[in-house]
Each structure stands twice: as C-alpha cells, then as structure tokens.
Amino acid sequence: MKLPLLGPVSVTGFQNPWFFLALLAVLLVIGLYVVQQFARRRRVLRFANMEVLERVAPPHPSRWRHVPTILLATSLVLLTTAMAGPTSDVRIPLNRAVVMLVIDVSESMASTDVPPNRLAAAKEAGKQFADQLTPAINLGLVEFAANATLLVPPTTNRAAVKAGIDSLQPAPKTATGEGIFTALQAIATVGSVMGGGEGPPPARIVLESDGAENVPLDPNAPQGAFTAARAAKAEGVQISTISFGTPYGTVDYEGATIPVPVDDQTLQKICEITDGQAFHADSLDSLKNVYSTLQRQIGYETVKGDASMAWMLLGAVVLAGAVLAGLLLNRRLPA
C-alpha cells in the first residue's frame, strides 16, 4: 500500500524484527497508566471530603482525558514498527542489461491485414519500444528471412537502432532459428565486454514474427527454432515472443493471392522452452501495447527497499497529537 506524501506502507520484510521487543515497554506504559488511574481514584475517595467532592467534581469524569495517553501509546507502536525496518518491493531502472529485438522480415510481413502492412506497423511499434526502453539498457537489432543479419549490435544509441528498424525490407523465407542464434551471439559478444567482476549482464530476446519457420522445415534441426530456443535456455536468456497479424492475412505473389495467416504455435513453444512470455497482436495499437508491457517488464528490476519512512512520519504526527491533546485536555503532557 502506498499513501500520498508518505510513500509505501509495508508490514512485511522486517530487517530488524527484534525491535518489536520494545512493544513490551508500550504494554508496560499502558499497564502503569491503568494502575495509576485506579490508585488515583482510591486516593481521592480516601482523603476527600465527600460532601465537597460531590459538589465540585463532575459525576462522570470525561473520557477525553484518556486520549493523550492512547495517542502516546499508538505513536510508540508506530515508531517501533519503523525501527524494525519494514521493506517493500521497489522497481528501479536496470543499468546493465542487453535486449535483442529480433524482427521477422519475411514476405508475409507485407500483408495488409494490419494497415498499412505488418512490417510497416512493426517498424513504428519497434521504434516506440526503442524510445521507451530504459536509456541505460543496451538494445540490439536482428532481422531474419532466409538468413539472419545483425543490423545493430547492442548499444545505448537509440538513434542507431531506429535507423536500423527503418531499413527493414521484406525478403523470402523464414529462418527463425537463425535469428535467435544471431541474437545469442551478439549477447555473448557484448557480455564478454561488459561482464567484468559482476558476470555477464542479464539479457532478453524479443522475437516478433507472423508465421511458422520454413528454413529449416524441422524446428528441431540443428539451426531450427526449437534448437535455438534450447540454446537460449542453456545460456539463461529468456525469449519473449510476439505473434503479429490476423488469420486473414494475404500477399500477392506472381499474380496469385496467397493466404498468410498468423501462426502462434511455434512462438508459444519457443516461450515454453525458455520460460518466456508469449504475446499476440493483431493491430498497430495492440502491438504498441505489447511493447509497452515488455518495456515495463524488461527495463526495471524489483528489489527490496526501505519502507520505514511512512511509519516514522505517522509516528511523529501521532506523537505531536498526543502532546497537543495533553496540553489542551489535561493541561499537561501525556503520561
């Protein structure tokens, strides 16, 4: 839970739970207060002139006199919770990661079922993804048709990546496995440079395609898509896939209209092998939404952060309220 002006309020992940032993002192304060109230009443009844007492003392003492002590006890509980060091999940931008954008440029990407055509829409959404991705992440670009080409090695230069995306042109065949292997090689190369003492940076492949692989025909062949996915799994690289298009896509080839329906099965299997996530998009807007989701997933990591400030501020406010209530109601500090 996150409160305005205060930040996250968490009751989990305490770093110093032994501070809760201080709550025993709070219980002691409450107990002493109760005992004091009973003792005070007995003293009054023992030594006071009852006729005078009945005339000057209110028949029922105001319950508001207990408010300062209640607030004091509450503030001590809040401050103790702050001292125990609660934590909450915090999303922080990644500053050393590699993302490879692998885009299918086979001739089926010229289908106009997604206006103006699949490839043009992919270009626009891909450039938006490049702009939105956390600036410190190294982004690379691979295109694949019959073969795969590393157009832009992983870099933080977004202009270079967008220029590479603009250069994409349709070509025959679909060699999905080649695209994945090329991306893995680029990841390995930049990892050897960036690794250092911290080891290779975390990496992710984002694979966008509209159809099943046809080079080779068997995805389990040495250069096939499933073989490449298993290689990615072995390297600890997740592959997120985007199947892009509709079941009604067509392209014109030598005077004939050829159906090119989108195929989800191959890409879903690649995700299963690598423990990645599969997406489907059938319009430019939905493709942009998918890329935005990926950007939020890839560009940040979740870590445990300190969440004691909210408890500290609440405790301070309640403590100030206890002091003020004591002065206004009882004409003394709460005790």
From Swiss-Prot:
Membrane topology according to the record: Multi-pass membrane protein
Entries under SMART domains matching the protein: VWA (SM00327)
PROSITE patterns, per database record: VWFA
Location of this chain's protein in the cell: Cell membrane
VWFA domain boundaries: 98-294
SUPFAM superfamilies in UniProt: vWA-like
GO cellular component terms given for this protein: plasma membrane
Location, primary (coarse class): membrane
UniProt keyword list: Cell membrane, Membrane, Transmembrane, Transmembrane helix
Transmembrane region(s): 18-38, 67-87, 309-329
PANTHER family per the UniProt record, alphabetical: LEUCINE ZIPPER PROTEIN 4, SPORE GERMINATION PROTEIN
Family: Belongs to the UPF0353 family.
Protein name (Swiss-Prot/TrEMBL): UPF0353 protein MAP_3435c
